[in-house]
């Protein structure tokens, strides 16, 4: 169908990107003028920064810079342009580099050097679903690429204990082995990559998760969760710390690698290590097999103990994991070792926690519609569009004065 000229003009106007206001509009105009054509802005698919514009003092000179993600008719891949204001306050393009693929997966800022500058970390996705990471540094008017590498996961955290951040990069090699690298700046500000040998090929077939946090001793730790077992669907954890003397990641000295592997071996593929309670320490989930933790119900629920192996008292939290909704209900630590889970005969679809030795009811749990009555029940929270409720048995006394049933529900990552 051939459109009349006036209708064709209207359609083209609708297809054209809307004019942006303020700094964004000025940045887009400056970029288009520099290119001599209209740039197509590229929005990150996920992450905290979801704009094609990143406004930040990148070089640490006290003046705001701008990074813009875009493509043109001439470029197959996403490009990154750096703009600064001139003396008149107008944005000017200083430099542009071509990125690693046609889609921006995520963008973040990292302070990888002990200066006021910060680096731009861009994750790209190619058509074959390959993921590439680039780290860009803008110093003294020059945009340089510090790192270009294929990756599966990355993490920006302080691992080495300095005043700057580090970049943890995880990828699977062609032979199936897992490669984990630490990108860190030395005391002179130069970047270097440190290989992290955490997941031995004889035990692990891949890396499921990487988490970083503080330890009870104030040092910085890295927790790796690796795929293991005959099926490759089980998980076990490795705990590492940065050694100042050797400048390498080494196993934590509080527990041997072998003991930790055995203790953290678990058969729930989604149960990864994480900072459960928000205290900055990454807890490792374990499925204790000691007598008195029995699931006799039909549900996919497991008793879990979350451990901080950097502490002389590692047990942090004991409770019940619901695999179907991926939530965790914390229970009083004093109940550990003497609980069984059974289906409730009194309430449809509910489960009961009972003591193993005396078969005494201590708590009933159920998932109900959000409109259901709370009478006689404690509301724990909303899980999968339903309400999780709990009820303590009438004669149950909890010795732990800090335990709050109403605060017991955690939605896991």
Q: For each predicted feature, which ranges?
A:
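Long protein-protein interaction modules used by eukaryotic assembly/scaffold proteins
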Residues: 396-413
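Beta-propeller-forming repeat regions
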Residues: 1-344, 373, 381-382, 387-391, ...
């Amino acid at each position: 169908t051939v459109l009349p000229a006036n209708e064709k003009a209207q359609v083209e106007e609708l297809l054209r990107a809307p004019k942006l206001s303020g700094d964004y509009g000025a940045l887009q105009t400056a970029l288009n003028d520099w290119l001599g054509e209209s740039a197509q802005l590229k929005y990150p698919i996920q992450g905290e920064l979801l704009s094609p514009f990143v406004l930040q003092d990148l070089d640490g000179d006290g003046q705001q810079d701008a990074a813009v993600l875009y493509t043109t008719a001439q470029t197959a891949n996403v490009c990154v342009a750096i703009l600064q204001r001139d003396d008149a306050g107008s944005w000017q393009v200083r430099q542009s580099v071509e990125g690693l693929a046609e889609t921006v997966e995520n963008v973040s800022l990292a302070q990888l050097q002990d200066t006021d500058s910060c680096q731009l970390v861009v994750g790209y996705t190619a058509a074959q679903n390959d993921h590439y990471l680039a780290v860009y540094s803008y110093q003294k008017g020059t945009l340089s690429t510090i790192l270009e590498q294929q990756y599966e996961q990355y993490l920006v955290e302080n691992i080495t204990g300095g005043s700057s951040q580090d970049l943890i990069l995880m990828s699977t090699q062609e032979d199936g082995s897992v490669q984990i690298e630490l990108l860190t700046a030395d005391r002179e500000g130069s970047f270097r990559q440190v290989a992290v040998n955490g997941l031995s090929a004889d035990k692990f077939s891949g890396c499921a998760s990487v988490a970083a946090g503080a330890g009870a001793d104030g040092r910085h730790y890295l927790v790796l969760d690796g795929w293991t077992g005959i099926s490759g669907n089980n998980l076990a954890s490795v705990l590492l710390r940065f050694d100042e003397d050797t400048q390498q990641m080494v196993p934590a000295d509080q527990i041997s690698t072998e003991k930790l592997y055995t203790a953290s071996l678990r058969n729930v593929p989604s149960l990864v290590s994480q900072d459960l309670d928000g205290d900055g320490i990454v807890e490792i989930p374990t499925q204790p097999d000691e007598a008195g933790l029995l699931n006799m119900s039909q549900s996919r629920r497991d008793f879990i103990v979350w451990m901080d192996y950097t502490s002389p008292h590692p047990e942090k939290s004991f409770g019940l994991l619901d695999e179907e909704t991926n939530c965790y209900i914390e229970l009083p630590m004093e109940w550990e070792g003497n609980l069984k889970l059974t289906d409730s005969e009194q309430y449809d679809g509910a489960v009961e926690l009972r003591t193993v030795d005396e078969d005494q009811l201590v708590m009933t749990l159920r998932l109900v519609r959000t409109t259901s009555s709370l009478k006689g029940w404690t509301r724990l929270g909303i899980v999968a569009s339903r309400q999780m409720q709990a009820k303590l048995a009438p004669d149950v006394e909890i010795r732990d004065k800090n335990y709050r049933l109403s605060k017991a529900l955690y939605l896991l990552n």
